[in-house]
């Protein structure tokens, strides 16, 4: 309905203007405008259809003015339709009377101006707009809060300097404070902000606010034209006033060449060459440290290495130097068996633990299983002329110590042996109820091969097949047990490390140790004095066969050391005359040689024993002895 009414009104207005002229035009347009406002309220100047405050401003902190919109009746309202009333608080209370605006004209249309008579700082104000007796808008403030100074005036610039290249220049911009602001007396303190740009640009470059009325601008191009403007604000406020008029700065071109394009530093080339140089340095570093880098990336596998040994010694084959180095450590002992002679020893088979419970050591020694050991003892020594497996220095020390020990115990030795014989005799009486029968075995005399050197060595018994068979027959025959002594007790340990064993059964001649007098039992145990003359070991042990006949010939007592292999010439000549009668009595029977002391423990299965000498006839004496001097031979031979 309203739209049709509006269209009808326009049509009537058009027809009326054709007839009555322009007199009725304002009235018709006013009614049409009201109709349009009712149809579409957004077409009005104020969408709220009410007057409203836009701003209140004090340019110098002495006066202020407020502005508002006129609302719906813009340009058509009657005078006095919109009014402004204000009130201010004096002391601590608001005045109850609202006062109307003192000046609607000085500040412009739709504004109210308050001069210095109506302005008070640090006192709050409240203002309101009324239309047809009703309040449409209201606002409260203080004068110092609405200060917005006027723009500065009198802008100009001064050239400071020009660069050596003639491309850039520095200028100084100056201006004057706003004329209505009492800056000289300090009533108001202002801050200024300068902005500049090239004429063809749209973005302004702002400088920091300053309190002075001049500021330098640096690095302006000489061939460009710049636009400069300034605005101000109160020191304690953030609201800037209006900008001043723009100042155009045109700098003359002082350079002889055109500077449309500045000299560009070749950053691109520098970056390329820099990367290339760094790459070359990196490659050189890797090439020079490739071994170290390889060890860091791929560490070598550690190999066993003995500290203190030079690998070159192992490559060159100097094993003696290696053994010397290793001998420094306590847990290493050099092995000399590679370069030593064969060592003869009796092998004891103790692999099977069950065999230990089958019988005694004596039964196993006499059994057929021990034939292997006898064969070893009966093997011929082709290496008899070689030196012993033990170092001469070590053996020389051991035998010297043994000689000292034997010399000091010369008096106590017979007494100790006598006591041991008594103990063995007592054990034999307890074990044997009936005396054993003595039978004289017939054996061939085994040959004794001696060492070439003057140092003692373990004895090797070698002979023909008949000798081996005779020895086996004698050991296997029960009747020959009377001629064998088994040493089961340790009587003494010498300083050289040898163990002296004591017999536990009858002697080889069939006479029990308890039936023999103490002098006979200790006849061959006396110590002899070692001499430098060489002679066979077998002749030194003839006192063993003389022992049964000592009752008749006790006046002759040869003195030699049982553990020594070589005897002196004096002892040999003393016993040479008696050997004939003694050997005739015992030539018919020859006992198996007995091992009275342990020389060394070769292995967990083997023992190296020192063998007692066997009596030999006169004819065998020279054949078995290869180391007799001429003087000794002249004394022995008739």
Swiss-Prot record:
The record's account of how the chain is modified after translation: The soluble form (GHBP) is produced by phorbol ester-promoted proteolytic cleavage at the cell surface (shedding) by ADAM17/TACE. Shedding is inhibited by growth hormone (GH) binding to the receptor probably due to a conformational change in GHR rendering the receptor inaccessible to ADAM17. On GH binding, phosphorylated on tyrosine residues in the cytoplasmic domain by JAK2.
Region (Required for JAK2 binding): 294-379
Region annotated Disordered, chain positions: 428-448
Motif (Box 1 motif): 297-305
Bias-annotated ranges (Low complexity): 430-447
Modified residues (Phosphotyrosine): 487, 595
GO molecular function: cytokine binding; growth hormone receptor activity; peptide hormone binding
Location of Phosphoserine modifications: 341
CDD domains: FN3
PROSITE patterns: FN3 (PS50853), HEMATOPO_REC_L_F1 (PS01352)
Domain Fibronectin type-III: 151-254
Membrane topology: Single-pass type I membrane protein
InterPro entries assigned to the protein according to its UniProt record, in alphabetical order: FN3_dom, FN3_sf, GHBP, Growth/epo_recpt_lig-bind, Ig-like_fold, Long_hematopoietin_rcpt_CS
Cellular component per GO, a single term: cytosol
Record's signal peptide: 1-18
Positions on the Extracellular side per record topology: 19-264
Glycosylation sites: 46, 115, 156, 161, 200
Tissues of expression: Expressed in normal and tumorous mammary tissues, being localized in epithelial and myoepithelial/spindle cell components and in the activated fibroblasts of desmoplastic tumor stroma. Isoform 1, isoform 2 and isoform 3 are found in both normal and tumorous mammary tissues, isoform 1 being the predominant isoform. Isoform 1, isoform 3, isoform 4 and isoform 5 are expressed in the CMT-U335 cell line.
Main localization category: membrane
Single GO BP term: growth hormone receptor signaling pathway
Cytoplasmic-facing ranges: 289-638
Cellular localization per UniProt: Cell membrane
Residue stretches spanning the membrane: 265-288
Quaternary structure (record): On growth hormone (GH) binding, forms homodimers and binds JAK2 via a box 1-containing domain.
Domain notes for this protein: The WSXWS motif appears to be necessary for proper protein folding and thereby efficient intracellular transport and cell-surface receptor binding. The box 1 motif is required for JAK interaction and/or activation.
Protein name: Growth hormone receptor
UniProt source species: Canis lupus familiaris
Classification of source organism: Eukaryota, Metazoa, Chordata, Craniata, Vertebrata
């Amino acid at each position: 309905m309203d739209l049709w009414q509006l269209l009808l009104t326009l049509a009537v207005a058009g027809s009326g203007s054709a007839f009555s002229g322009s007199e009725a035009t304002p009235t018709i347009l006013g009614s049409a405008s009201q109709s349009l406002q009712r149809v579409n309220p957004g077409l009005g100047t104020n969408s709220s259809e009410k007057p409203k405050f836009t701003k209140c401003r004090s340019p110098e902190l002495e006066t202020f003015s407020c502005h508002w919109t006129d609302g719906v009746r813009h340009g058509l309202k009657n005078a006095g339709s919109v009014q402004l009333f204000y009130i201010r608080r004096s002391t601590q209370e608001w005045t109850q009377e609202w006062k109307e605006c003192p000046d609607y004209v000085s500040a412009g249309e739709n504004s109210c101006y308050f001069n210095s008579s109506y302005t008070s700082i640090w006192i709050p104000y409240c203002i309101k707009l009324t239309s047809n007796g009703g309040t449409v808008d209201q606002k409260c403030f203080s004068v110092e809060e609405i200060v917005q100074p006027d723009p500065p005036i009198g802008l100009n610039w001064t050239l400071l300097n020009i660069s050596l290249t003639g491309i850039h220049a520095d200028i100084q911009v100056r201006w004057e404070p706003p004329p209505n602001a009492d800056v000289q007396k300090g009533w108001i303190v202002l801050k200024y902000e300068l902005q500049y740009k090239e004429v063809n640009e749209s973005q302004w470059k702002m400088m920091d606010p300053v309190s002075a009325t001049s500021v330098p601008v640096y690095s302006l191009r000489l061939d460009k034209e710049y636009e400069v403007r300034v605005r101000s604000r109160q020191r304690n406020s953030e609201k800037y006033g209006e900008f001043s008029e723009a100042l155009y700065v045109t700098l003359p071109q002082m350079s002889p060449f055109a500077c449309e394009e500045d000299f560009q530093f070749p950053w691109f080339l520098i970056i390329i060459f820099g990367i290339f140089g760094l790459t070359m340095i990196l490659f050189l570093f890797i090439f020079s440290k490739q071994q170290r880098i390889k060890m860091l990336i791929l560490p070598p596998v550690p190999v066993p290495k003995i500290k203190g040994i030079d690998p070159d010694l192992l490559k060159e084959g100097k094993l003696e130097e290696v053994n010397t180095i290793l001998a420094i450590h306590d847990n290493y002992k050099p092995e000399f068996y590679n370069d030593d002679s064969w060592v003869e020893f009796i092998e004891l088979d103790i692999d099977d633990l069950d065999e230990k419970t089958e019988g005694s050591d004596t039964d196993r020694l006499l059994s057929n299983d021990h034939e292997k050991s006898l064969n070893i003892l009966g093997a011929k020594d082709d290496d008899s002329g070689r030196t012993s497996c033990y170092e001469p220095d070590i053996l020389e020390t051991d035998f010297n110590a043994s000689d000292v020990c034997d010399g000091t115990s010369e008096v106590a030795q017979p007494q100790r042996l006598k006591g041991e014989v008594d103990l063995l005799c007592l054990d034999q009486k307890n074990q044997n109820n009936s005396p054993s029968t003595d039978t004289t075995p017939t054996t061939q005399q085994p040959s004794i091969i001696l060492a070439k050197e003057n140092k003692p060595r373990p004895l090797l018994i070698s002979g023909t097949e008949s000798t081996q068979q005779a020895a086996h027959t004698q050991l296997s025959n029960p009747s020959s047990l009377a001629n064998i002594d088994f040493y089961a007790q340790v009587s003494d340990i010498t300083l050289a490390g040898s163990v002296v064993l004591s017999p536990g059964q009858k002697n080889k001649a069939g006479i029990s140790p308890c039936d023999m007098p103490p002098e006979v039992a200790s006849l061959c145990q006396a110590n002899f004095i070692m001499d430098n003359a060489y002679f066979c070991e077998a002749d030194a042990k003839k006192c063993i066969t003389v022992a049964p006949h000592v009752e008749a010939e006790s006046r002759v007592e040869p003195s030699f050391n049982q553990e020594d292999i070589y005897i002196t010439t004096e002892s040999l000549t003393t016993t040479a005359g008696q050997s004939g009668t003694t050997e005739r009595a015992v030539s018919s029977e020859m006992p198996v040689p007995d091992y009275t002391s342990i020389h060394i423990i070769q292995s967990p299965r083997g023992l190296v024993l020192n063998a007692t000498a066997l009596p030999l006839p006169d004819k065998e004496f020279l054949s078995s002895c290869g180391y007799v001097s001429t003087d000794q031979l002249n004394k022995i031979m008739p």
